Amino acid sequence: MIIVTGGAGFIGSNIVKALNDKGITDILVVDNLKDGTKFVNLVDLNIADYMDKEDFLIQIMSGEELGDIEAIFHEGACSSTTEWDGKYMMDNNYQYSKELLHYCLEREIPFLYASSAATYGGRTSDFIESREYEKPLNVYGYSKFLFDEYVRQILPEANSQIVGFRYFNVYGPREGHKGSMASVAFHLNTQLNNGESPKLFEGSENFKRDFVYVGDVAAVNLWFLESGKSGIFNLGTGRAESFQAVADATLAYHKKGSIEYIPFPDKLKGRYQAFTQADLTNLRNAGYDKPFKTVAEGVTEYMAWLNRDS
Protein backbone atom coordinates (compact mmCIF):
# COMPACT_ATOMS: atom_id res chain seq x y z
CA MET A 1 0.00 0.00 0.00
CA ILE A 2 1.10 3.56 -0.74
CA ILE A 3 -0.17 6.40 1.47
CA VAL A 4 -0.70 9.89 0.06
CA THR A 5 -1.44 12.56 2.67
CA GLY A 6 -3.18 15.58 1.21
CA GLY A 7 -4.28 13.09 -1.43
CA ALA A 8 -7.48 15.00 -2.21
CA GLY A 9 -5.50 18.22 -2.61
CA PHE A 10 -3.73 19.64 -5.63
CA ILE A 11 -0.34 17.93 -5.78
CA GLY A 12 -1.47 14.90 -3.78
CA SER A 13 -4.26 14.02 -6.20
CA ASN A 14 -1.86 14.40 -9.13
CA ILE A 15 0.49 11.92 -7.44
CA VAL A 16 -2.48 9.53 -7.05
CA LYS A 17 -3.20 9.98 -10.77
CA ALA A 18 0.44 9.30 -11.68
CA LEU A 19 0.36 6.13 -9.55
CA ASN A 20 -2.89 5.07 -11.25
CA ASP A 21 -1.26 5.64 -14.64
CA LYS A 22 1.34 3.04 -13.59
CA GLY A 23 -1.41 0.62 -12.64
CA ILE A 24 -1.11 1.25 -8.89
CA THR A 25 -4.43 1.50 -7.06
CA ASP A 26 -3.59 0.13 -3.59
CA ILE A 27 -3.51 3.68 -2.24
CA LEU A 28 -4.69 5.12 1.07
CA VAL A 29 -5.62 8.78 0.72
CA VAL A 30 -5.42 10.84 3.91
CA ASP A 31 -7.00 14.28 3.89
CA ASN A 32 -9.38 16.67 5.59
CA LEU A 33 -12.55 16.88 3.52
CA LYS A 34 -14.10 19.66 5.60
CA ASP A 35 -13.92 21.47 2.27
CA GLY A 36 -16.14 18.93 0.55
CA THR A 37 -15.45 20.36 -2.90
CA LYS A 38 -12.07 18.59 -2.92
CA PHE A 39 -13.75 15.24 -3.60
CA VAL A 40 -13.82 16.19 -7.30
CA ASN A 41 -10.03 15.72 -7.39
CA LEU A 42 -10.48 12.02 -6.60
CA VAL A 43 -13.70 11.19 -8.41
CA ASP A 44 -11.96 9.91 -11.57
CA LEU A 45 -9.15 8.16 -9.68
CA ASN A 46 -8.87 4.69 -8.16
CA ILE A 47 -7.89 4.31 -4.50
CA ALA A 48 -8.25 1.51 -1.97
CA ASP A 49 -9.21 3.56 1.09
CA TYR A 50 -9.68 7.03 2.57
CA MET A 51 -8.93 8.22 6.10
CA ASP A 52 -9.48 11.55 7.81
CA LYS A 53 -6.27 13.34 8.73
CA GLU A 54 -7.09 13.52 12.46
CA ASP A 55 -7.90 9.79 12.66
CA PHE A 56 -4.71 9.01 10.75
CA LEU A 57 -2.60 11.15 13.09
CA ILE A 58 -4.08 9.42 16.17
CA GLN A 59 -3.13 6.03 14.70
CA ILE A 60 0.38 7.23 13.79
CA MET A 61 1.00 8.71 17.26
CA SER A 62 -0.24 5.55 18.99
CA GLY A 63 2.18 3.51 16.90
CA GLU A 64 -0.66 1.48 15.44
CA GLU A 65 0.31 -0.62 12.43
CA LEU A 66 -1.46 0.39 9.24
CA GLY A 67 -0.52 -2.67 7.21
CA ASP A 68 2.25 -3.21 4.68
CA ILE A 69 3.24 0.32 3.63
CA GLU A 70 5.45 0.66 0.57
CA ALA A 71 5.91 4.44 0.85
CA ILE A 72 4.33 7.64 2.16
CA PHE A 73 3.98 10.74 0.00
CA HIS A 74 3.37 13.52 2.50
CA GLU A 75 1.66 16.37 0.65
CA GLY A 76 -0.81 17.29 3.40
CA ALA A 77 -0.23 20.76 4.85
CA CYS A 78 -1.68 24.21 5.20
CA SER A 79 -0.28 25.78 2.03
CA SER A 80 -1.72 29.27 2.42
CA THR A 81 1.08 31.85 2.37
CA THR A 82 -1.38 34.41 3.79
CA GLU A 83 -2.24 32.38 6.92
CA TRP A 84 -0.64 34.06 9.96
CA ASP A 85 -1.88 31.74 12.75
CA GLY A 86 1.55 30.44 13.71
CA LYS A 87 0.34 27.81 16.17
CA TYR A 88 -2.00 26.31 13.58
CA MET A 89 0.73 26.41 10.94
CA MET A 90 3.36 24.76 13.16
CA ASP A 91 0.95 22.05 14.35
CA ASN A 92 -0.26 21.33 10.84
CA ASN A 93 3.00 21.57 8.92
CA TYR A 94 5.81 20.92 11.41
CA GLN A 95 4.59 18.66 14.24
CA TYR A 96 2.46 16.50 11.96
CA SER A 97 5.41 16.02 9.59
CA LYS A 98 7.73 15.05 12.46
CA GLU A 99 5.30 12.42 13.75
CA LEU A 100 5.00 10.94 10.29
CA LEU A 101 8.74 11.02 9.67
CA HIS A 102 9.50 9.08 12.86
CA TYR A 103 6.76 6.56 12.09
CA CYS A 104 8.48 5.94 8.74
CA LEU A 105 12.01 5.83 10.17
CA GLU A 106 11.06 3.23 12.78
CA ARG A 107 9.64 0.99 10.04
CA GLU A 108 12.09 1.91 7.26
CA ILE A 109 9.29 3.22 5.05
CA PRO A 110 10.34 5.64 2.27
CA PHE A 111 9.13 9.15 3.17
CA LEU A 112 8.73 11.67 0.34
CA TYR A 113 7.45 15.06 1.45
CA ALA A 114 6.48 18.50 0.21
CA SER A 115 8.77 21.36 1.11
CA SER A 116 8.52 24.73 -0.62
CA ALA A 117 10.43 27.46 -2.41
CA ALA A 118 8.89 29.75 0.25
CA THR A 119 11.89 28.66 2.37
CA TYR A 120 14.02 31.06 0.27
CA GLY A 121 11.98 34.16 1.09
CA GLY A 122 12.61 37.28 -0.95
CA ARG A 123 15.77 36.21 -2.76
CA THR A 124 16.28 37.16 -6.39
CA SER A 125 19.13 34.74 -7.09
CA ASP A 126 20.86 31.63 -5.72
CA PHE A 127 17.86 29.43 -4.95
CA ILE A 128 20.15 26.72 -3.61
CA GLU A 129 19.27 24.03 -1.06
CA SER A 130 21.62 25.29 1.64
CA ARG A 131 21.10 27.12 4.94
CA GLU A 132 22.80 30.36 3.92
CA TYR A 133 20.24 30.93 1.15
CA GLU A 134 17.14 30.38 3.29
CA LYS A 135 15.19 33.23 4.87
CA PRO A 136 11.41 32.73 4.69
CA LEU A 137 9.09 35.76 4.57
CA ASN A 138 6.00 34.18 6.17
CA VAL A 139 5.08 31.61 8.79
CA TYR A 140 4.17 29.07 6.09
CA GLY A 141 7.69 29.31 4.66
CA TYR A 142 9.13 29.13 8.16
CA SER A 143 7.21 25.93 8.99
CA LYS A 144 8.59 24.30 5.84
CA PHE A 145 12.11 25.60 6.46
CA LEU A 146 12.12 24.32 10.04
CA PHE A 147 11.07 20.82 8.97
CA ASP A 148 13.81 20.79 6.32
CA GLU A 149 16.30 21.73 9.04
CA TYR A 150 14.96 18.90 11.21
CA VAL A 151 15.34 16.45 8.32
CA ARG A 152 18.92 17.60 7.73
CA GLN A 153 19.85 16.52 11.25
CA ILE A 154 18.38 13.06 10.66
CA LEU A 155 19.47 12.33 7.08
CA PRO A 156 23.05 11.18 7.88
CA GLU A 157 21.80 8.47 10.27
CA ALA A 158 18.63 7.43 8.41
CA ASN A 159 18.35 3.82 7.26
CA SER A 160 15.46 4.53 4.89
CA GLN A 161 14.70 7.05 2.18
CA ILE A 162 13.81 10.63 3.15
CA VAL A 163 13.35 13.09 0.31
CA GLY A 164 11.93 16.61 0.39
CA PHE A 165 10.87 18.59 -2.66
CA ARG A 166 10.97 22.37 -2.66
CA TYR A 167 8.06 23.03 -4.96
CA PHE A 168 8.28 26.27 -6.88
CA ASN A 169 5.17 27.76 -8.58
CA VAL A 170 3.15 24.66 -9.35
CA TYR A 171 0.10 24.94 -11.62
CA GLY A 172 -2.17 22.55 -13.46
CA PRO A 173 -5.19 20.25 -13.10
CA ARG A 174 -6.99 19.69 -9.78
CA GLU A 175 -6.23 23.03 -8.09
CA GLY A 176 -9.72 24.55 -8.39
CA HIS A 177 -10.48 24.09 -4.68
CA LYS A 178 -7.59 26.39 -3.69
CA GLY A 179 -9.57 29.57 -4.31
CA SER A 180 -7.35 32.65 -4.07
CA MET A 181 -4.26 30.41 -3.73
CA ALA A 182 -4.85 28.76 -7.13
CA SER A 183 -2.47 29.64 -9.96
CA VAL A 184 -2.68 32.74 -12.15
CA ALA A 185 -3.47 30.49 -15.14
CA PHE A 186 -6.52 29.11 -13.30
CA HIS A 187 -7.82 32.59 -12.42
CA LEU A 188 -7.24 34.01 -15.91
CA ASN A 189 -9.14 31.08 -17.44
CA THR A 190 -12.05 31.58 -15.03
CA GLN A 191 -12.21 35.31 -15.78
CA LEU A 192 -12.23 34.70 -19.54
CA ASN A 193 -14.95 32.05 -19.27
CA ASN A 194 -17.05 34.44 -17.15
CA GLY A 195 -16.84 37.09 -19.85
CA GLU A 196 -14.59 39.31 -17.72
CA SER A 197 -11.30 40.96 -18.64
CA PRO A 198 -8.42 38.82 -17.37
CA LYS A 199 -6.49 40.76 -14.74
CA LEU A 200 -2.81 41.03 -13.87
CA PHE A 201 -0.92 43.30 -11.48
CA GLU A 202 0.80 46.26 -13.08
CA GLY A 203 4.40 45.36 -13.84
CA SER A 204 3.61 41.67 -14.40
CA GLU A 205 6.12 41.49 -17.23
CA ASN A 206 8.75 42.10 -14.53
CA PHE A 207 7.42 39.56 -11.99
CA LYS A 208 9.05 36.27 -12.91
CA ARG A 209 8.53 32.92 -11.27
CA ASP A 210 9.62 29.38 -11.87
CA PHE A 211 6.27 27.98 -13.03
CA VAL A 212 6.31 24.17 -12.97
CA TYR A 213 3.56 21.95 -14.39
CA VAL A 214 2.02 19.60 -11.83
CA GLY A 215 2.39 16.59 -14.13
CA ASP A 216 6.16 17.14 -14.07
CA VAL A 217 6.07 17.45 -10.27
CA ALA A 218 4.28 14.11 -9.94
CA ALA A 219 6.76 12.49 -12.34
CA VAL A 220 9.72 13.61 -10.20
CA ASN A 221 8.06 12.24 -7.06
CA LEU A 222 7.58 8.81 -8.65
CA TRP A 223 11.11 8.79 -10.10
CA PHE A 224 12.58 9.36 -6.64
CA LEU A 225 10.52 6.56 -5.13
CA GLU A 226 11.94 4.21 -7.77
CA SER A 227 15.52 5.52 -7.44
CA GLY A 228 15.60 5.45 -3.63
CA LYS A 229 17.67 8.67 -3.50
CA SER A 230 17.49 10.84 -0.36
CA GLY A 231 17.97 14.56 0.20
CA ILE A 232 16.23 17.91 -0.19
CA PHE A 233 15.78 19.03 -3.79
CA ASN A 234 14.42 22.03 -5.63
CA LEU A 235 11.53 21.10 -7.88
CA GLY A 236 11.03 23.70 -10.56
CA THR A 237 11.99 24.01 -14.21
CA GLY A 238 15.17 26.02 -13.70
CA ARG A 239 13.60 28.80 -15.80
CA ALA A 240 11.98 32.02 -14.60
CA GLU A 241 9.10 33.14 -16.81
CA SER A 242 6.86 36.16 -16.36
CA PHE A 243 3.23 36.31 -15.29
CA GLN A 244 2.76 38.04 -18.63
CA ALA A 245 3.94 34.84 -20.36
CA VAL A 246 1.27 32.88 -18.46
CA ALA A 247 -1.36 35.39 -19.61
CA ASP A 248 -0.10 35.29 -23.20
CA ALA A 249 -0.37 31.47 -23.29
CA THR A 250 -3.88 31.62 -21.78
CA LEU A 251 -5.10 34.23 -24.28
CA ALA A 252 -3.48 32.31 -27.16
CA TYR A 253 -5.48 29.22 -26.18
CA HIS A 254 -8.77 31.11 -25.87
CA LYS A 255 -8.08 33.25 -28.95
CA LYS A 256 -9.82 36.20 -27.29
CA GLY A 257 -9.55 38.80 -24.53
CA SER A 258 -7.05 41.44 -23.48
CA ILE A 259 -5.35 41.95 -20.15
CA GLU A 260 -6.57 44.57 -17.68
CA TYR A 261 -3.73 45.74 -15.44
CA ILE A 262 -4.60 46.50 -11.81
CA PRO A 263 -2.56 48.27 -9.09
CA PHE A 264 -0.28 46.14 -6.93
CA PRO A 265 -1.92 45.76 -3.46
CA ASP A 266 -0.21 47.44 -0.50
CA LYS A 267 -0.70 44.41 1.75
CA LEU A 268 1.59 42.31 -0.46
CA LYS A 269 4.44 44.81 -0.65
CA GLY A 270 7.56 43.37 0.96
CA ARG A 271 5.89 39.96 1.31
CA TYR A 272 5.78 39.02 -2.33
CA GLN A 273 8.34 36.93 -4.19
CA ALA A 274 9.06 39.00 -7.31
CA PHE A 275 11.43 36.39 -8.74
CA THR A 276 12.00 32.66 -8.29
CA GLN A 277 14.16 30.28 -10.28
CA ALA A 278 15.09 26.83 -9.06
CA ASP A 279 18.73 25.83 -9.13
CA LEU A 280 18.45 22.27 -10.46
CA THR A 281 22.09 21.28 -9.90
CA ASN A 282 21.29 18.85 -7.08
CA LEU A 283 18.23 17.39 -8.84
CA ARG A 284 20.23 16.75 -12.03
CA ASN A 285 23.18 15.36 -10.06
CA ALA A 286 20.78 12.90 -8.39
CA GLY A 287 20.09 11.54 -11.87
CA TYR A 288 16.77 13.11 -12.87
CA ASP A 289 17.36 14.13 -16.48
CA LYS A 290 13.90 14.56 -17.99
CA PRO A 291 12.90 17.97 -19.41
CA PHE A 292 10.28 20.22 -17.79
CA LYS A 293 7.44 21.84 -19.72
CA THR A 294 7.76 25.53 -20.55
CA VAL A 295 4.94 27.89 -19.57
CA ALA A 296 3.68 27.87 -23.17
CA GLU A 297 3.56 24.05 -23.22
CA GLY A 298 2.18 23.56 -19.72
CA VAL A 299 -0.45 26.29 -19.84
CA THR A 300 -1.71 25.05 -23.22
CA GLU A 301 -2.10 21.52 -21.83
CA TYR A 302 -3.76 22.90 -18.68
CA MET A 303 -6.21 25.05 -20.67
CA ALA A 304 -7.26 21.99 -22.70
CA TRP A 305 -7.93 20.14 -19.42
CA LEU A 306 -9.83 23.03 -17.80
CA ASN A 307 -12.03 23.55 -20.85
CA ARG A 308 -12.45 19.86 -21.75
CA ASP A 309 -16.23 19.91 -21.27
CA SER A 310 -16.92 23.20 -23.01
UniProtKB/Swiss-Prot annotation:
Pathway assigned to this chain's UniProt record: Nucleotide-sugar biosynthesis; ADP-L-glycero-beta-D-manno-heptose biosynthesis; ADP-L-glycero-beta-D-manno-heptose from D-glycero-beta-D-manno-heptose 7-phosphate: step 4/4
Function: Catalyzes the interconversion between ADP-D-glycero-beta-D-manno-heptose and ADP-L-glycero-beta-D-manno-heptose via an epimerization at carbon 6 of the heptose.
GO biological process: ADP-L-glycero-beta-D-manno-heptose biosynthetic process; carbohydrate metabolic process
Domain characteristics, as noted in the entry: Contains a large N-terminal NADP-binding domain, and a smaller C-terminal substrate-binding domain.
Active-site residue numbers: 140, 178
Pfam families referenced in this protein's UniProt entry, alphabetically: Epimerase
Listed InterPro entries: Epimerase_deHydtase, Heptose_epim, NAD(P)-bd_dom_sf
EC number of this enzyme: 5.1.3.20
Protein name per Swiss-Prot or TrEMBL: ADP-L-glycero-D-manno-heptose-6-epimerase
Catalytic activity: ADP-D-glycero-beta-D-manno-heptose = ADP-L-glycero-beta-D-manno-heptose
Record's keyword terms, sorted: Carbohydrate metabolism, Isomerase, NADP
Binding residues annotated for substrate, in chain numbering: 169, 180, 187, 201-204, 209, 272
Cofactor: how bound: Binds 1 NADP(+) per subunit.
GO MF entries: ADP-glyceromanno-heptose 6-epimerase activity; NADP binding
Subunit structure: Homopentamer.
Cofactors, names only: NADP(+)
Binding positions for NADP(+) per the UniProt entry: 10-11, 31-32, 38, 53, 75-79, 92, 144, 170, 178
Protein family per UniProt: Belongs to the NAD(P)-dependent epimerase/dehydratase family. HldD subfamily.
